[in-house]
Amino acid sequence: MNVWIIIGIGVVAIVGVCYAIYKRKINHAREQQRLTLTQNISHELKTPVASIRGALETILMHPDMDEEQRRQFIERAYQQSGRLANLVEDISTINKLDTQTDFYTRLQLDLHTIVENVLQDLSLRTTQAGATITHKIPKHLIISGNYTLLYSIFHNILDNAINYVDKAEINIQLTNQDPANLYFSISDNGPGIPTEALAHIFERFYRVDKGRSRKAGGTGLGLSIVKHAVIFHDGNITAVNRIEGGLEYQFSLARRSK
């Protein structure tokens, strides 16, 4: 009997030690994640802040600057302030999705209406970029979800395609549905992305083309928000290069939250 008691105590002790090691590793991983995120945020903030400061310093140091030059520097500062505002907003969204998911309430929503609203809001940029967007989302496609996050899913993916594909032809489709889930595809006619990048494009601050991404005004958080928003709706998302060319996002959304 004493032998079994000793064995039992030993097993409990081993389990306790293993759990403590596991928790330590988890806490270390979280701390490393927070540190990396802080470093990335600091790095991303430097560019717009430096640009704004540089433009304003130039104006202050040259009070006799002609009006046209002054206007150009003011416009540059204004554009960078917009980028800074977008970055702060995206960081806030990511933080809420990480720690305050109850912040986002769910309602019965029509996905057709949401997609139409996204297309309307992107219409000017779509025209300026020479892009075309078509969709086959049926009317009255109801889902229990959060409007802001569902809007972000479609907006951020389309925004990426418009930014990085010349004269993009983008297609949005409801590819399948069952009693529990809706399945979507958003594809473009661009060159796709390197295969090794496919596994990373939903990571925070990951950029396939760093120079072009910053030039386009991206925050590096758009697709990470997409992934978090899909997970919030009990779905999954992947990106694949199409055989015929272009990038395709395939994702699912639960009709009703669990």
Predicted regions and their residues:
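Short acidic helix/loop segment immediately C-terminal to the autophosphorylated histidine
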Residues: L60-E67
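Short alpha-helical segment of the dimerization/phosphotransfer core of two-component systems
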Residues: Q79-A85
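Conserved catalytic submotifs in the C-terminal HATPase_c
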Residues: T105-Q108, T127, T132-L141, Q177
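Short helix-loop "hinge" at the ATP-lid/N-box region of the Bergerat-fold HATPase_c
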Residues: A161-I162
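Conserved glycine-rich
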Residues: A168, D234-G235
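Short conserved segment of the HATPase_c
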Residues: I193-R207
